[in-house]
Amino acid sequence: IQVATKLAPYPWRIGNRGFNKPFLKSLERLNNKLDIVQLHWSTAKYNPWQELGLLNNLCDLKDEGFDFEIGLSNIGPKRLMKLIKFLAKRDQHLKSVQIQFSLLAPDLGKQYQVKKICDENKIDFLAYSPLSFGILCIDPDKEENKEKSFIRNSLFENYKKPTYELRRCLKRIAHQRSVSQAQVAINWCCYQGTIPLVGMRKKSQVIDVSNVFNWNLKKNEFKVLQEISKKCFKKMPKNPFSSN
């Protein structure tokens, strides 16, 4: 098990010591078990020098003897290449990149560019929101129970109709393979060599997700999902902080 955290580059966290306090607080909360520290988002769009100082800060902490690896999140291919080179000058290898990646993710073309760079540089590609906030788990032929959250209810209602064909395909494959819709959607991520980060709140969800690794999508199943995904024009919202 690897423990990872994300440190946010808030405006007041600047310079080569901006992450010292939140890093030490995280380390304390996690009982000194912290394997990966990620920059939560790129500041390239509005304050590019800030993230360089904060990454220098993480490199300094490693030089001081703290044992962890550095990761990035919500970053585009151009900025990723620059930061890989930046870290290399500090003799540091980037461990991971965390990106929104699912059948409903926006800008999948850009995500695939990031994935290619990760593969070429032996960087782990972490796929967050692989179930698109649970939308891909909704049974296309049944009315789901109302969620406790008003925001989630509104989200589900807005996406039910536009994603119907995609969810129907997920259900068909799930039925043929005797698995859940969630497993199919997650397996789509695994098929492409990513590491999906799945949010789980219930024991039943943990058990279900653990079974993802007992089977693999077939090539024809993957292709069908790809085709239907492309036809689905209602994608998840873009992360406003994601860089180019």
Where are these regions (language model features)?
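A short, structured active-site edge motif that brings together acidic residues
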Residues: 1-11, 37-40, 98-103
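Hydrophobic/aromatic pocket-lining and membrane-interface residues
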Residues: 3, 26, 34
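Active-site mouth loops of central-metabolism enzymes
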Residues: 6-17, 42-49
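Short, acidic/polar
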Residues: 15-30, 78-84
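Generic alpha-helical secondary-structure signal
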Residues: 18, 22, 37, 187-188, ...
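Active-site groove signature of glycoside hydrolases
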Residues: 29-46
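Beta/alpha (TIM)-barrel catalytic core signal, keyed to glycine-rich beta->alpha loops juxtaposed to Asp/Glu
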Residues: 42-244
